[in-house]
Amino acid sequence: MASFPESVNENDIDKAKFIGELLVPMAPFDQKAGREAWTVAFAPDGSYFAWSQGHRIVRLIPWAKCLSSFSVRHGGEVTNPTSPRHLSRQSCKGGSVIPMAGAPPEHTIDCGGIVWGMAFGSSVPEKQSRSINIEWHHFQFGRDQLLLATGLNNGRIKIWDVYTGTLLLNLMDHTDIVRDLTFAPDGSLMLVSASTDKKLRVWDLKDDGNMVKVLWGHPNRVYSSAFSPDSSVLCSVGASKAVLLWNMDKYTLIRKLEGHHNDVVSCEFSPDGALLATASYDTRVIVWDHQRGSILLELGHLFPPPSPIFAGGANDRWVRSVSFCADGRHIASVSDDRLVRFWSIEERAPQAVASLPNGLCCAFSTTGSVLAAGTCDGSVHFWECPRSIASLQHLCRMALRRVKTTQQVEALPVPMPLRDFLTYRVV
């Protein structure tokens, strides 16, 4: 068994540039159990980076500080090409750090339980509550409001003010681990929680955190969920090979996607909303045309490709996480073979790889220039994403697919090769 197909020479694959890491304090949190960094997240405006460093602790750090400590600038330009840098263990110890004048503050938050899921949410004041229209609310979220939602192992969800580190809301309805959280990207502060109690719950934070809907349909544990860029569709994935698509205007099930052979643990839409990537314990990342329910691309992590029976068991190549880059052309995945892979949607083999023992999760920065990945020891590692100038054709395709569905593109009076390109059938 190999990590790459026979046609690919591993030595020919580029090594991703490692730029730095965040380390957790050694004491008092030096026990091996409970140190896992189950989740990492970037604020939508790129102002903050957050990660669960184990033992109930979430660390909030201004992303500009991380970049200044590493070897890239805000735009991804290399400033120190020879040596990556690290934020020391001392700099990650508890308490609030007093920032320089004008700099955003850092916070260390004790969430009261092991943090499995985490998400940033920002408000758009003109977006009204979807569930109720009343004049008075306890919380009035302004344009500059930035929230952090944390999902705990006891089923609770806690909402924090990022700028002050204070607890705003405590949401209680799940009966098991909250594995993932995701905010609608339209600024409505609609929050979806995915739990191992087999349920998805929809919360309206503009209505003081009231629960709007429970989405039933998963036969087993729910591991992750993701909104489409226009907030109209939700994808949820879980145990028993489940990949479900939901209409978030009507809160109804659209369809189930079939193709995985094991638990599906991570999902994310492309920036234009045309593609959906799902990661599974069956050693694969599948890229879907979710509007047609068809598979466009399979990114394998074990070769020769395993049989469905072997893929459905303990195959030592479980894919833990997948993330789409902001350029719409690159995908990153973390798997149990101690590698992070950077993929191009135009190729079947990784464009670059990096070593990462015991990786658990990954996320691209808002600009897509940096990938962050959390590990079992609570640390977070950072790499530069392979970058290249996107073609004008790809930029035009992304612009079109933000407003046109696959079915609408297929109805356009254009040549078949162009139609295939616009619907990503040539990836």
From Swiss-Prot:
CDD domains: SOCS_WSB1_SWIP1, WD40. Residues 379-427 form the SOCS box domain. Keywords: Repeat, Ubl conjugation pathway, WD repeat. WD repeats lie at residues 129-170, 173-213, 217-256, 259-298, 314-353. SMART domains: SOCS, SOCS_box, WD40. It comes from the Eukaryota. GO terms for biological process: intracellular signal transduction; protein polyubiquitination. The keyword Electron transport does not apply. InterPro entries: G-protein_beta_WD-40_rep (IPR020472), SOCS_box (IPR001496), SOCS_box-like_dom_sf (IPR036036), WD40/YVTN_repeat-like_dom_sf (IPR015943), WD40_repeat_CS (IPR019775), WD40_repeat_dom_sf (IPR036322), WD40_rpt (IPR001680), WSB_SOCS-box_domain (IPR051983). Probable substrate-recognition component of a SCF-like ECS (Elongin-Cullin-SOCS-box protein) E3 ubiquitin-protein ligase complex which mediates the ubiquitination and subsequent proteasomal degradation of target proteins. Component of a probable ECS E3 ubiquitin-protein ligase complex that contains the Elongin BC complex. The SOCS box domain mediates the interaction with the Elongin BC complex, an adapter module in different E3 ubiquitin ligase complexes. This is WD repeat and SOCS box-containing protein 1. It comes from Takifugu rubripes. The lineage of its organism: Eukaryota, Metazoa, Chordata, Craniata, Vertebrata.
